Every structure is written in C-alpha cells, then in structure tokens.
C-alpha cells in the first residue's frame, strides 16, 4: 500500500546516496542486466532503514540479513527503472515539484520547512528529489504493466455492491502486516517443504512473542518487507481473496497462516480492525442564473454592470428573475426556462460559479459572478440531501475488486520480472 505521495520524511526506501557522506572508491554490489547496484547504494539504504527503525522502535535483524534484503530490493528497483528507460517513461520537473508539494502538505509543512527537516536528518534536497523521481518512475511502470492484467466484470461489481449493502455495522477494514516466503516457478517438493516448515516456525515464534516486524525484515520477499511488512489499512474486499477467506472472523492481534499461494507462503498479522460508514448522501442545489457573455458590443465591465442593475431591479420588485433570464440570458440550455438549472450537484458547475452558489442562502441572489463562460447572476432556490449510497457502493465495489486483483497480479508480475532478468550478486551468487 505504499504510495510515493505519502512518503514520510527521512525515508525514501529506494534511496541511493541519501546520506551525503564522503565516498571512497565505489564497488559494484550486483550486476542487473545492463546496469549495476553500487555498494554505496546498499550502504545508504542500510543507514536509512536503521535510522527509521530506531525512530519507530522497530527491531532489526543482523546486518548480513538486512544487507541481503536491501540488495534484493535495490535489484528489483533497478530492473523496473531500466524498464522505464526502455519505455520512454519520464517524470517532468513539474510533476516532481507537485509530488514533493503534496508530501510537504501531508506532513503539514511548507517546502522550506521540508528542506530544513531534510537537512536536519542529513539528507541533501537534490538527492531527495532524485529519489522521489525514482519512486514515481517505479510506480508508473508497475501501475501501467499490472493494470493491463486486471479485468473487473460488471457482474462482479454488482454482486459485491449487494454484499456491501447488506453489511450492517461489521468491522470490515483491517490494518495488516505481511510476510511472504517465496517459491520459485515449478518448485520441487523439497523447496515447498522447506518454505512451509520455515513459515510454520515463524508463526510459532510470533505466537511466543517474537517481533513480527523484525521477522518480516529478515525473511519476507514482499515489497513492504523493509517497513516491517506493514501493509496499512484496507477493506476486506480489497485484500486478495485467498487472504480474505481467512480474515472474516479475526480479532485484533491475531496471526493468520501459513497460507499457500501461487507465489509462496504468507503470514498475516491483524494489527487493528475498524468499521466504515455505509450511508452516503450528497447535497444537491436547485438554482437559476442569468448569463451575459462579453462581446464586441458589450465589454466585460458593461456586462458586470448590466447584471448588477438587473439584480437591483429584482430586489426592488420591479421585475422578476425568470423574466429577465428569458430576456437577457445567453445560456441556451436554461434561458427559455427562466434560467432554471434544475437539481444538480454543485461540483458539476464551473468552480467560480460553484463557490458563489454554495455561499448563498435559500432565495438569495448573488452579486455578478465571473466564470470561464462570462458573467452570471445566480439565485439559490433550494437545497436537498440525496442518498447516493447505491452509486457509492458500486464505485466502492469496483475499487475494492480492482485493488484486490491488482495486489494479486503485482506480486506475480514482480516475480516474473525478477526471474527474467540477468542478476549477479558480486559475492558469488548468480540468478
């Protein structure tokens, strides 16, 4: 559930040279197709993971195990970044600036405050930008490649929407952590037995009080391994079906597994459970307006003044809104109806029109308002609350099914890319 838009300060998990310490002659840690992972990359991420683990109070495995996990992570990132280069995928400076602005805002900081925070943690801002760019590229490639493998059928959406409608007060959102013990394609029985025995051993250790996060960092091949396996919050229906079937009656703190899938053995921990609000209503407005568009015969200021005069006449009672709309309005869709726009969600209107409309009281007429269409005089006739639960449930059902299928396919896709790449770790291991 990682998203580059919500990266916490001080950690870019794919960081390379995040710490601006002087470097000796660099070494190659791994060869990955036509590129390499440098020893400095591994060391930098090692420091970053240790720093964040210390701040979070997270236990870590020994350095050798942690270094192995970090090397695997950087190899996978390298494979995907090479794919981005071959596909011609780029992140513009504007996109990068917006992403970093979002990160700062989500941390309730300005850009200057973000820079200061990074400096306090020993991070160079330009290096930080480079790492966020890499995160964006990796996300873009993964999303593009996996999305095309996911199909959501209308009947699936309808079925799940009905299930959501029938749920009342159930705790249907879970905060999970995850350990994946992978299996190769076409594993031997010995490989299956070894992975299953390890999974069973880990479950026993966890039940006896071992730290789940430390075991995830040590053993897991999931993309969230270096975060202690934390997947974050997700609806039950968003979780892969194989997991969801085992999570319907769980309690907070419960450990589930081992679960066998096509990619390996899984262990889950339920960190927390919460319910969701099932009822969805929106405010609709009933409004009418008069639109005058500036032209060669009527300047912008003249159009504004004309509507101000009309507003005063309506308030004085010398004319009425509908009559003036039929006479003056240049909106062909509503002029003949006295400017009546009917019932609608305010969000469908031009932002300037919407904002002015939402400030009006029932029966009140606005001052002349300028939008991208011209000058408007707006009157709010009424408001109402409309139950949009059915539409919201279908939208929620689609999103849940898509997210669940995406998560299932993403892990398979990543294993396929890893298996197809030439990788040589310089300590002698070759894949």
UniProtKB/Swiss-Prot annotation:
Cross-referenced Pfam families: Rotamase (PF00639), Rotamase_3 (PF13616), SurA_N (PF09312)
InterPro entries xrefs: OMP_Chaperone_SurA, PPIase_dom_sf, PPIase_PpiC, PPIase_PpiC_CS, PPIase_SurA, SurA_N, Trigger_fact/SurA_dom_sf
Superkingdom of the source species: Bacteria
GO BP annotation list: Gram-negative-bacterium-type cell outer membrane assembly; protein folding; protein stabilization
Record-annotated PpiC domain positions: 171-272, 282-382
Keyword Transport listed: no
Range of residues in the leader sequence: 1-20
Chief location of this protein within or outside the cell: periplasm
Molecular function (Gene Ontology), one example: peptide binding
EC number: 5.2.1.8
Catalytic activity: [protein]-peptidylproline (omega=180) = [protein]-peptidylproline (omega=0)
GO terms for cellular component: outer membrane-bounded periplasmic space
Compartments in which it is found: Periplasm
Keyword line: Chaperone, Isomerase, Periplasm, Repeat, Rotamase, Signal
Described purpose of this protein according to its UniProt entry: Chaperone involved in the correct folding and assembly of outer membrane proteins. Recognizes specific patterns of aromatic residues and the orientation of their side chains, which are found more frequently in integral outer membrane proteins. May act in both early periplasmic and late outer membrane-associated steps of protein maturation.
Domain commentary: The PPIase activity resides only in the second parvulin domain. The N-terminal region and the C-terminal tail are necessary and sufficient for the chaperone activity of SurA. The PPIase activity is dispensable for SurA to function as a chaperone. The N-terminal region and the C-terminal tail are also required for porin recognition.
Protein name (Swiss-Prot/TrEMBL): Chaperone SurA
Lineage: Bacteria, Pseudomonadati, Pseudomonadota, Gammaproteobacteria, Enterobacterales
Gene of this entry: surA
